[in-house]
């Protein structure tokens, strides 16, 4: 049995083209952030050229050390901050399933039993299917925003892995340098103590002065202070390494006797280098996600169309109520927000401003990236020149 007049609903659907034309006037034009980002990147100056550059695929290829690779592996598995980033990525993936589910029909079933004093027990069963038509692409925009959230979080996770690898590498190299400095200072102290002993023997024999003895003892004491400072600095770096690898107890490691070879990665053009950085790509994905949510907020001002089909049956027994003689109905509902105190319009404006904030956050990330690269290249260039001057001085 049918409860609807199809012709009446077809006539009402004729108004949909008019509603779609009105949607074009409600949704505003957003700034072309792609063009703005391209302009920002083109303003970056060329990088300094460094000699002896090497193409590497991974950060741990910069340092040839099995012990460092083992520590880095532990850090990737145990660092709590990195694990939080991974869990957040899994949350974004589940949220994407939620957003995708809004585009699909909702199906529900129910059963009931009714008993009264003046009638027999009646049993009922119903099956309903509801679906919201995506007239304006609002649900598609919401799903696209969820996809971009996954892209952003995945890139942030990659950036966090790169940052963690760089921090572990820096602490590892610092520990090697401090251990070498501590060994040198201990050897120097042994030499100073030997000198102090000779001066003391000469002083006892009346061949030296008290000033020479005081100077020797001061040098030994100063060296002892330097050893304490180096030892504490080494201990602090060990604690920092323990935090990075995500362990409460001190990690077991063996420092190499010599400095490891550290290669200089190849530097490409600024635009190519910046476009490969995961933090910048994540910031760009955040702009796109915010822009998609702005579209969703403005489309909330438009009418929505939902359809619902219900199949129900009633019988004197549970078996008889299982759709032996069902009654079906179809409901089409077109709802338009007329007045909500300006909340929907304010929400759309907020989303638009959040997109502008995402763009400024991209600019901030870009500035930090350029600063990091330029400072690293400048420091490396200065170290190369210092090494050349030292080699010249030693050869003289």
PLM segments and residue spans:
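Membrane-embedded beta-strand positions in outer-membrane beta-barrel channels/transporters
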Residues: 72, 126-128, 172, 270, ...
């Amino acid at each position: 049995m049918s409860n609807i007049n199809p012709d009446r609903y077809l006539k009402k659907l004729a108004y949909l083209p008019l509603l779609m034309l009105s949607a074009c006037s409600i949704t505003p034009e957003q700034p072309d952030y792609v063009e703005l980002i391209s302009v920002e990147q083109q303003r970056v100056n060329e990088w300094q050229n460094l000699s002896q550059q090497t193409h590497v695929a991974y950060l741990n290829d910069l340092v040839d050390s099995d012990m460092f690779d083992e520590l880095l592996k532990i850090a990737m598995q145990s660092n709590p901050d990195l694990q939080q980033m991974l869990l957040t990525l899994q949350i974004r993936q589940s949220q994407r399933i939620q957003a995708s589910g809004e585009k699909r029909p909702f199906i529900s079933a129910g059963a009931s039993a009714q008993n009264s004093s003046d009638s027999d027990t009646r049993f009922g069963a119903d099956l309903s299917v509801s679906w919201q038509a995506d007239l304006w692409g609002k649900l598609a925009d919401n799903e696209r925003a969820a996809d971009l959230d996954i892209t952003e979080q995945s890139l942030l996770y990659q950036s966090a892995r790169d940052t963690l690898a760089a921090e572990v590498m820096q602490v590892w190299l610092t520990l090697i340098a401090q251990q070498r400095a501590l060994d040198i200072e201990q050897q120097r102290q042994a030499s100073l103590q030997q000198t102090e002993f000779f001066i003391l023997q000469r002083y006892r024999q009346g061949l030296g002065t008290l000033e020479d003895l005081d100077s020797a003892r001061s040098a030994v004491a100063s060296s002892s202070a330097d050893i304490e400072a180096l030892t504490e600095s080494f201990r602090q770096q060990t604690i920092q390494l323990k935090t990075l690898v995500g362990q409460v107890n001190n990690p077991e490691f063996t420092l190499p006797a010599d400095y490891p070879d550290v290669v200089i990665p190849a530097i490409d053009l600024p635009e190519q280098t910046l476009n490969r950085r995961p933090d910048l790509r994540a910031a760009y994905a955040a702009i796109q996600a915010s822009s998609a949510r702005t579209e969703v907020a403005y489309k909330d001002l438009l009418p929505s169309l939902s359809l619902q089909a219900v199949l129900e049956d009633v019988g004197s027994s549970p078996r008889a109520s299982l759709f032996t003689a069902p009654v079906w109905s179809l409901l089409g509902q077109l709802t338009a927000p007329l007045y909500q105190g300006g909340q929907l319009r304010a929400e759309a404006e907020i989303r638009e401003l959040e997109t502008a904030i995402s763009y400024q956050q991209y600019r901030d990330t870009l500035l930090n990236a350029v600063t990091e690269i330029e400072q690293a290249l400048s420091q490396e260039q200065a170290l190369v020149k210092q090494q050349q001057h030292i080699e010249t001085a030693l050869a003289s």
